[in-house]
Every structure is written in structure tokens, then in C-alpha cells.
């Protein structure tokens, strides 16, 4: 029996040795794997807890280590957790305020005083008389006759001019029917002032028992009319007369040739910087309301330069202001109109100019002011108007008023089919004339109301230029010439200019335009919140709340990236687990076959095991041992 157990003991010893070797091999593999993990170029944490604990133990952000070092005291851990995340919230609230201020794009206004030579601005003077009445008398005779009758009906005023020669009467008879028809479609009426009228139409300074004046413009079928109301009869008559006047001008093909372009008949004397002006120093244009206009220093190739301030270092003009041959219903003001503007900019006399009084010396002192705005995201300005959706109808450079007037004229041409006589025409358009465009007045005045209410969007579309040069003006007045000197002054002027001044003091005026001081003001904008300022503010807040640096931010970014990586790894592992759970489960036939191969456990022979053996055989070795025993029993 003992001899039979010896081979069996040998087998068991061999199995023990094999089990020990297998265990040592597995331990070596585990150690090698740990070594490879420690020496790996890129390693990942096995759980979120491991990641968070590593971050708190090694980060340079203040307060993070207190989240793990006090984990044995849950109260402290909870306190530091609340404090840590509350501090984070406060810091990012401050970040939000800083970012909001940065993206509002604030600017700093820089004020500079420059003392250098000035470029003298352009100066425009107008006669305040559109045309010589004698040159247009034949064309205006019929309109004057209808106006005279209208004034008689409304105000019992006999407007007798004493200028009705035979030629004018024949002209009136030939064209009376055509003009009378159009005037009758746009009548001037007097209305009883309504107590329920709007405040604009019902001025509180005018008695309610008084009358208000209006003229009507109707559409082609006379089914709808627009009434242009005026509280002043003078304004109403002048506007009504001007409306018919521009219709007459649009019919005259050679209206521009009626201009009085003789410089000497309007400008008696011209001197700049105590040097006499010549013809190369001015340009001429005509305005349908303000008449002949002369612009000095408009030539950009030879501009006047002013080295010193003062009245003797500027422009001095003596102009004629008599009204012997003015159109009475248009020229209600005597004198001249002057405007100071930049070169290559149109002179809008109705907006930026002011009148010069006859018999008065007007001294205009100027202060130059330049404004440079930041474009792009800092302000809604334009560099040259190329990005403004309005076609420039003027030949000058872009200004806000050029854009607004071009926008209005384009709207008139689009809606009414013709252009207003006061503005330049787009290509292919014609000026409005109620002989050709019957209801253009109705269209124009309704469009004018929309324009003033900004329903056309012109004031919104037209942006301010980024660079603007303005001149602040202040005027002083004195009697000129004085009583003691007027005799010889008028005598010399009448002999020198070969013009007989009948009204004397009301026939001339003097204008002086000069710089008030040596320096001029320049306003510039600079960004108040740059990227450098933004980073400085963010760094200050980060250091205030956590006492950290840029590298601490990098650590936080690394934590976020590791968190994302672990999440991806766990997600992939979870998907693999779900796929392995979908494999087929072994059937009962397979189980029965397995049990048929192995005998019942009680039938196996028992082997004696030495008590000094600590390591147990592996499952595979025992399985092979059982199979051998079964085969030996079957052999026996």
C-alpha cells in the first residue's frame, strides 16, 4: 500500500512545485506591469477619486489640499468644500463683470492742444437772391399775377410791382392756362383755427380766433390731398411760391446761364493775410434759393495757411448787399449769407451758414476742433462712407449731411419718379415738374413728413465720419462805415467798382474771418480696455481669491482634460462589458456532458497532504489530477 502511495506523492509534490512556479510567474508579471505603468509616458487614473485626490495633493491653488487632508473630519471637509466652491463662484462673478466691461468696448477721450500752422478753411458767401428779377420776369409774370390775386383774396393786399411791360403781358397770356391749371391744383387757403388741432398746428402764441394758412397738394385723381399747415402767413406764402418757382426753373433748360457770375459786382474788396485775393482763390456755384455763391480757398492744390491769429491775419471782404433787383417773394432777407466749412465739402447754406447784416462789420472768430473716433467695434462711424448703403450724389467726400441728402433724393426719385431741384440727380433721373409729374408735390410732402420722422431710415443709415474737423464760430458786430468816414468810403467804393450805391449804408457790408487763438484742440479716442488690461484684471482677481498664477490655471485645465479622458475610458469599458454580456449562455447538453466526464466527488481517492505545505495547487492542476485518476480507475 505504501508503494502504491509513493507515485501519488511524487505527483502531488510535482504539482506543488508547478503551482509555486506559476504563482511566482504571475507575481513577476504583476510586478512588471506595475513597473511599466510607473514608467509609462502617458498614464491615466483609475477612478475619479484617485484623480481628485492627486490634484488636491499636488496643485498650487490655495485651499485645495484642505479638501483631502481633513477627510477624517467630515465637518472640516464640508466647510472647506463649501468655502472653496463659494470662492470660485465669487471669482467667476468678478470675471463676468470684467468680460462685460471689455466687450462694451469703452474708450478714453484724449485732449491735445496743437500749436502749429493752420490750414485756413473754405469760406462761402451767397447773395441771398436766386436770380435777377429782370432775367426771370417773363417766366415769373404769370406766377406773380396769380400770387397777387391770392394775396388780395387772403389779406386784401395789392401787390403792385409796376413792372408789367407789354412783353411780360404777352408772355402771361400765352402761358396763363397751363400754369393756372397747376396752381389751381395746389391752392393756398385760409382755415379757421381748430381748437382740437394738434399743438404743432395750434400754436399757443396765436389766438384761436385767428386763421391758419395751408396749401394743398393732391394725388393725380384728387382723391387724397395732403395739407401743409403754417401758423405764419409769411412762411406759407413763401413756401407756396417757392414750390411753383422750382417747377418753373425745372422747365428752363438754360437756367444756369441766368446766373450772375460777375465776381466784381458782388465782392467789392477781398484780402487774405493782408494780401489781395485773385480769381484763382475762389470758385462760383449757384443755389436756387441763396443765389450766386463764391467759395474762397476751395482749391486743394494751393491752400491758404494761417500762421498767426487775429483779424489782420484772416480773410476780409467788402460785399454788396443792395436789393434793387431781388425777387420779392423769395428774397425776404437783405444782406449776405456766409458759411465756414472744410475743403472738398459742399456748403449747405441752409444749415451751417448765417446772415451778414448790411451796414455792419461782422467779425467772425474761429476755433478749430478735430475729432478722431475709433471705428470698428468701438463706435458706429465710417472712414470714407464706402460701407454706408447710400449712394453719394455729391462730388465731394463723405459727410453725414451729404449722405442724408443723398438718401432723401434717392427716396424721392424712387417713390415719385423724379428728383427735387435742390439736390443733385442720380444718373438717368430728371427734375420734378408738375407739367410732367402731375402729383409729385403730393408725393414729395408726404415723403418729407416720413423723412423728418426717420421713417425712411436715412438718419440711421448715415453714420458719422470717424474723422471730423469743425470750426466753432463767434461773431461780433459794429457799425461800418462810421458816420465820420462813410462819405469818403462810399465815394471810393462807387468809383472803384463803377456802381452807384443809392441806398449807401444798406448797400454794403464788411466781413472779417480769422482764427481766435494760436492753438487748436484735437480730440482723440483710444481703447480704455485692451487685451493687456483684460489679462491684468483677470490675473488680479485670480490672485486675490486663490493666490495662484498662470501655471495654476494650466493645472486646472489639466484636471479638466484628465476628467474627460477618464470619462471616455470608463464609457468604453462600460460598452465592452455590455457587449460581453450579450454572448450565448452554455446549454444543458453541454453541462450533462461535462458531468458525465467527471465522476462524483465522493468516488475520488483521497490524498494525504503534508501540513507544512502552505501553497495550494491551482485549479487547473487539480482538474488535470482528477482527470488522470478517472482514467486510471477506468483502466483498472
Swiss-Prot record:
Extracellular-side segments: 99-549
Main subcellular location: membrane
Protein's cellular compartments: Apical cell membrane; Cell projection, Cilium; Cytoplasmic granule; Cytoplasm
Catalytic activity: Na(+)(in) = Na(+)(out)
A GO term for molecular function: ligand-gated sodium channel activity
Gene3D superfamilies: Acid-sensing ion channels like domains, YojJ-like
Transmembrane feature ranges: 78-98, 550-570
Pfam family, one: ASC
InterPro entries reported in the protein's UniProt record: ENaC, ENaC_chordates, ENaC_CS
Activity regulation as described: Originally identified and characterized by its inhibition by the diuretic drug amiloride.
Keyword terms: Cell membrane, Cell projection, Cilium, Cytoplasm, Cytoplasmic vesicle, Disulfide bond, Flagellum, Ion channel, Ion transport, Membrane, Sodium, Sodium channel, Sodium transport, Transmembrane, Transmembrane helix, Transport
Disulfide topology: 126-293, 218-225, 270-277, 381-466, 403-443, 403-462, 407-458, 416-443, 416-466, 418-432
Cytoplasmic face residues: 1-77, 571-636
GO terms of biological process kind: sodium ion transmembrane transport
Bilayer topology annotation: Multi-pass membrane protein
Residue segments, region Disordered: 1-28
GO cellular component: acrosomal vesicle; apical plasma membrane; cytoplasm; motile cilium; plasma membrane; sodium channel complex
Function: This is one of the three pore-forming subunits of the heterotrimeric epithelial sodium channel (ENaC), a critical regulator of sodium balance and fluid homeostasis. ENaC operates in epithelial tissues, where it mediates the electrodiffusion of sodium ions from extracellular fluid through the apical membrane of cells, with water following osmotically.
Family per similarity comment: Belongs to the amiloride-sensitive sodium channel (TC 1.A.6) family. SCNN1A subfamily.
Subunit structure: Heterotrimer; containing an alpha/SCNN1A, a beta/SCNN1B and a gamma/SCNN1G subunit.
Protein name in UniProt: Epithelial sodium channel subunit alpha
Organism: Anolis carolinensis (Green anole)
Origin organism lineage: Eukaryota, Metazoa, Chordata, Craniata, Vertebrata
